[in-house]
């Protein structure tokens, strides 16, 4: 029994449904997909950044190309136009990307984009103006340079305008750094040239025409170049790029947080789903366990359906419980609520377990403290149940109140370690135990009803037979009275030597026998109220042992052997005493020489019903009283008729045929059975099966009357008992009976005491204290005094009238009255 999950009632009310688990799975998948999916359009963002970088590059290239075109290094304006086209395309692409991206709606990106567009438009206009004016400027410069170079003398210049003339120098200086002063000087110089004579008019006209154009266009071109060079397009593009990166970074942080949240939610939902599935699986397992438990209850009920004995049914049921809880052993004890001792014990295996009394007392005390509680403990198996082959390990012990008078204690033993079972498993064990106890109680009540029914049937039959026999017996008594009266008169009227006198004597003798038979019939027909009480068969036999001895001839030896188990039955000890006397007398009458009669008391278990000569004995537990002899035996033809009234094989020797008939009647009154087995020439055995009782046995004195125990006159009684407590108890009993007790621990101590000249009137020796080489029958020879041997319940006690002065055996426990009669008998003899 492991630690299984046991859902509570609330778990079943709030448990997840399959559709809810499916919904949670879908939600977890959605959250997981959202956690791993891309939220931002990374491709768009990267394209925006790429376009911004292209704008930066194209803007720088445009400024370079404009500068080169301004200096005249490049005469082709196609690169400038292509750069402008690229910038316009980049701007349009950027607008399209911004419309696709959510960044436009965030922060200052849209405003920066508009500023970039304005900047590009301004640059575009400046480049267009630059292109037109720079072409004209370059043409004017070329014409001006050619005209200036064609002038002779000091004013002439070469193709590179590097001739050291004043006009060329001033123009070159103006080209480098335009200023109004230089422009004014150049204008004066041009006017001077126009007024100068002797110069070629065509170059002078060209200089006069192109010079002012250069002076007016060059500052404008310079301004346009400066405007293009100082354009904020690249700066705005970089600002927009930084803004995009910042927004992108913030969005990444938010996205990462959202991803973490969604991932965590997905993982949490997955864990919750796993928990729900686990609990659902556990609840399913628990429901399956409950179904198995229902099958267990059915199987336990099946065990009690047949005619099997209660012990066999309980044993089969315990095996089912043991298998259900995966245990190695299983035992059940029904403990008396008040006396705290096991009334009945059952085990999954045979023989029955022997429970530790201290454990039972402790658990009964715990159960009585709170009658509503179930006591549950886990302790060592060796501390609970003692078996021939003990199971090492731990045992689960469960106790609860079964009835008003009984407490059920169930033990499950395990060879290996097992975790503490859950509350649900404990409840199942309690319910299974309660179910088993219920069936045992029902079977017990059925058995009691059957016993009462048999007793009632027997009583009614006896009443009917007794009424008939009583009427007949009274009529025969009257007839016999007349016959015997007249026979006695006739006897007195004839002489002693007469043959008639002898015939009359035969008539009187036969009449006396008839009177004896009629007396027995009248005894059977008397309506006496039976006293039914629980009593111990062993104690009864111990009490009547001297009476049995006196009722038998001196050539017959009696031996007794008692089992250690309880032998309590319900009925009248007087009837059982009559049964023993009748059977023992019949056995002694079947012996011609020295004979032996053995009386054995034990417990018997009948697994199946048994067919007897006089009925069918059902299975179950019984107290077995066996009486066997070594006589001549009973012939097979006679055996079926021995319990019939008036059947006898000793009609000529005074047999009435009512002795065994009364035995059968008494045993039927006990609701018992008799099984007789006999072998001619070897002896006969009477096995009397009596139903046991779980009640506390009463003292036999309550039936036989408490006679005053005989007292002594200070005689010395030596006692050998190794148990200190038991020796003190015996000494107190002996002193209370009027004797002087002298106690010894060992047999050697009393032998040394006697060897020193001390004498005792009687010696009582516990058989356990005898040396191994010392026979109990030779104790009185060693100690040279009368002795009584005290033994256990399994002591073989021999009583022989010839040997009564030599040995006497008393089985434990010994009552004060039995001890008093035994001591008095030995001292007197």
Swiss-Prot record:
**Positions modified as 4-aspartylphosphate?**
766
The record's Gene Ontology cellular component field reads: plasma membrane
**Which GO MF terms does the UniProt record name?**
ATP binding; identical protein binding; phosphorelay sensor kinase activity
- Modification Phosphohistidine, positions: 474
Response regulatory domain: from which residue to which, for each copy? 716-827
Q: How does it sit in the membrane?
A: Multi-pass membrane protein
Keywords for this entry?
ATP-binding, Cell membrane, Crown gall tumor, Kinase, Membrane, Nucleotide-binding, Phosphoprotein, Plasmid, Transferase, Transmembrane, Transmembrane helix, Two-component regulatory system
Source organism, top-level taxon: Bacteria
Main location per the UniProt record: membrane
Reactions catalysed according to its record: ATP + protein L-histidine = ADP + protein N-phospho-L-histidine
Every copy of the Histidine kinase domain together lies at 471-694
Q: Where are the transmembrane segments?
A: 19-39, 260-280
Q: Could you tell me what this protein does? A: Activates VirG, by phosphorylating it, in the presence of acetosyringone or hydroxysyringone.
Q: What is this protein called?
A: Wide host range VirA protein
What species was this sequence derived from?
A: Agrobacterium tumefaciens (strain 15955)
This protein's encoding gene: virA
């Amino acid at each position: 029994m492991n630690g299984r999950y046991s859902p509570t009632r609330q778990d079943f009310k709030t448990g997840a449904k399959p559709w809810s688990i499916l919904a949670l799975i879908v939600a977890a998948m959605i959250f997981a997909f959202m956690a791993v999916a891309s939220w931002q359009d990374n491709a768009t963002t990267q394209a925006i950044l790429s376009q911004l970088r292209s704008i930066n590059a194209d803007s720088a290239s445009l400024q370079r190309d404009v500068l080169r075109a301004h200096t005249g290094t490049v005469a082709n304006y196609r690169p400038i136009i292509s750069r402008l086209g690229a910038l316009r395309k980049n701007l349009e692409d950027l607008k399209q990307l911004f419309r696709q991206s959510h960044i436009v709606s965030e922060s200052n990106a849209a405003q920066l984009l508009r500023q970039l567009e304005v900047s590009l438009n301004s640059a575009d206009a400046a480049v267009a103006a630059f292109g037109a004016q720079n072409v004209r400027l370059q043409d004017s410069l070329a014409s001006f340079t050619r005209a200036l170079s064609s002038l002779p003398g000091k004013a002439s210049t070469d193709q590179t305008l590097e001739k050291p003339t004043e006009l060329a120098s001033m123009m070159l200086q103006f080209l480098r750094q335009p200023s109004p002063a230089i422009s004014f000087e150049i204008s004066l110089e041009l006017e001077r040239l126009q007024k100068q004579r002797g110069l070629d008019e065509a170059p002078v006209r060209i200089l006069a025409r192109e010079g002012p154009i250069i002076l007016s266009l060059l500052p404008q071109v310079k301004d346009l170049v400066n405007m293009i060079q100082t354009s904020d397009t690249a700066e705005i593009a970089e600002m927009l790029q930084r803004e995009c990166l910042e927004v992108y970074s913030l969005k990444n942080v938010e996205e990462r947080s959202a991803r973490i949240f969604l991932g965590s939610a997905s993982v949490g939902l997955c864990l919750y789903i796993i928990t729900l599935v686990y609990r659902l699986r556990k609840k399913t397992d628990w429901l399956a366990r409950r179904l198995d438990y229902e099958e267990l209850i059915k199987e336990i009920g099946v065990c009690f359906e047949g005619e099997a004995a209660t012990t066999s049914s309980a044993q089969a049921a315990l095996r089912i419980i043991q298998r259900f809880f995966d245990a190695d052993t299983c035992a059940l004890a029904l403990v008396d609520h008040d006396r705290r001792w096991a009334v009945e014990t059952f085990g999954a295996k045979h023989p029955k377990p022997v429970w530790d009394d201290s454990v039972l007392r402790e658990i009964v005390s715990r159960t009585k403290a709170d009658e509503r509680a179930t006591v549950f403990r886990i302790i060592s198996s060796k501390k609970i149940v003692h078996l021939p082959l003990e199971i090492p390990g731990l045992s689960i012990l469960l106790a609860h109140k079964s009835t008003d008078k009984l407490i059920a204690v169930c033990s499950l033993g395990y060879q290996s370690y097992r975790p503490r079972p859950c509350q649900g498993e404990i409840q199942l064990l309690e319910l299974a135990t309660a179910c088993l106890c219920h069936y045992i109680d029902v079977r017990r009540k059925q058995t009691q009803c059957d016993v009462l029914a048999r007793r009632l049937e027997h009583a009614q039959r006896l009443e009917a037979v007794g009424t008939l026999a009583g009427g007949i017996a009274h009529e025969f008594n009257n007839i016999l009275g007349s016959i015997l009266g007249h026979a006695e008169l006739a006897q007195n009227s004839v002489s002693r030597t007469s043959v008639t006198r002898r015939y009359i004597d035969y008539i009187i003798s036969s009449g006396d026998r008839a009177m004896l038979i009629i007396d027995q019939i009248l005894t059977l027909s008397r309506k006496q109220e039976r006293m039914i009480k629980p009593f111990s068969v062993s104690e009864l036999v111990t009490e009547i042992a001297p009476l049995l001895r006196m009722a038998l001839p001196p050539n017959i030896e009696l031996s007794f052997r008692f089992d250690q188990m309880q032998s309590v039955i319900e009925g009248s000890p007087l009837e059982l005493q009559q049964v023993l006397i009748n059977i023992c007398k019949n056995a002694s009458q079947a012996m011609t020489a020295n004979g032996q009669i053995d009386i054995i008391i034990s417990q018997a278990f009948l697994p199946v019903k048994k067919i007897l000569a006089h009925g069918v004995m059902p299975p179950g537990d019984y107290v077995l009283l066996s009486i066997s002899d070594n006589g001549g035996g009973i012939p097979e033809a006679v055996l079926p008729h021995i319990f019939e009234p008036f059947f006898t094989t000793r009609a000529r020797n005074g047999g009435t045929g009512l002795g065994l008939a009364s035995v059968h009647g008494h045993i039927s009154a006990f609701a018992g059975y008799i099984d007789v087995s006999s072998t001619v020439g070897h002896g006969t055995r009477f096995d009397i099966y009596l139903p046991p009782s779980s009640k506390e046995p009463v003292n036999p004195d309550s039936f036989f009357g408490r006679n005053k125990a005989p007292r002594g006159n200070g005689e010395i009684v030596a006692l050998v008992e190794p148990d200190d407590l038991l020796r003190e108890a015996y000494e107190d009993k002996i002193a209370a009976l009027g004797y002087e007790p002298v106690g010894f621990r060992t047999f050697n101590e009393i032998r040394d005491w006697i060897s020193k000249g001390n004498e005792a009137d009687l010696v009582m020796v516990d058989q356990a204290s005898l040396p191994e080489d010392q026979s109990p029958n030779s104790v009185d020879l060693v100690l040279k005094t009368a002795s009584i041997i005290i033994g256990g319940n399994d002591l073989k006690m021999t009583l022989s009238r010839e040997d009564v002065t030599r040995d006497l055996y008393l089985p434990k426990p010994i009552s004060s009255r039995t001890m008093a009669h035994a001591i008095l008998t030995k001292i007197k003899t």
